[in-house]
Amino acid sequence: MIELKNVNKYYGTHHVLKNINLSVKEGEKLVIIGPSGSGKSTTIRCMNGLEEVSSGEVVVNNLVLNHKNKIEICRKYCAMVFQHFNLYPHMTVLQNLTLAPMKLQKKSKKEAEETAFKYLKVVGLLDKANVYPATLSGGQQQRVAIARSLCTKKPYILFDEPTSALDPETIQEVLDVMKEISHQSNTTMVVVTHEMGFAKEVADRIIFMEDGAIVEENIPSEFFSNPKTERARLFLGKILKN
């Protein structure tokens, strides 16, 4: 379980997260939505120790993150898929996938490569194992990044707007891979996204944020058909109209 307890985050005098209380259960698919600047990405980055909270606690598997232990804990339990793919350009796809398992988890090359081939097949890129990232489309690179996160076999995968940097033509291929993972895997997924169709289909629970606060928490069927708050209704009215 990942828990945020009374989490506040400031950038200077700017209050970015305001008393966030949130728990993510094992195996849950949690989707965080809201307008730009609402604190969604900061929330998920706090979960992974990429941002230090100003006050409150972040707890991962009953371990409270602090500046001394956060790297060790998050490396053990959390994988992250970013807006931009962060693949090593001088390494092949296969080398990108086997680096962390071999270096950090001390897997043998044989075991790491077997796992890499398994997940390249899952994301539909088995034939791209020996090419370099620059030869791939944006959608393909993001699918490689997802496969890389799966190769670490960590219990939590956090997705920070994984389709926002993609061309419209390649967004669906990434969403399809994420849907497949959500249906076949017991992995806990936390997804920040503007893709409402994906949220409706995949999420066990929706978190709607605005101005650094959680405004509404609901199951998808209720949130999209009958949101509890006026702000959520206005947001959905605008975004679904487009």
From Swiss-Prot:
Compartment(s): Cell inner membrane
Top-level taxon in the UniProt lineage: Bacteria
Binding-site list for ATP: 34-41
Protein name: Probable ABC transporter ATP-binding protein PEB1C
Topology in membrane: Peripheral membrane protein
Domain ABC transporter: 2-236
Keywords associated with the record: ATP-binding, Cell inner membrane, Cell membrane, Membrane, Nucleotide-binding, Transport
InterPro entries, alphabetized: AAA+_ATPase (IPR003593), ABC_ATPase_HisP-typ (IPR030679), ABC_transporter-like_ATP-bd (IPR003439), ABC_transporter-like_CS (IPR017871), MetN_ABC_transporter-like (IPR050086), P-loop_NTPase (IPR027417)
Single GO term (MF): ATP binding
CDD domains with a match to the protein in the record: ABC_HisP_GlnQ
Coiled coil: none
Role noted for this protein: Most probably involved, with PEB1, in a binding-protein-dependent transport system for an amino acid. Probably responsible for energy coupling to the transport system.
Cellular component, GO, one term: plasma membrane
Family: Belongs to the ABC transporter superfamily.
Organism: Campylobacter jejuni subsp. jejuni serotype O:2 (strain ATCC 700819 / NCTC 11168)
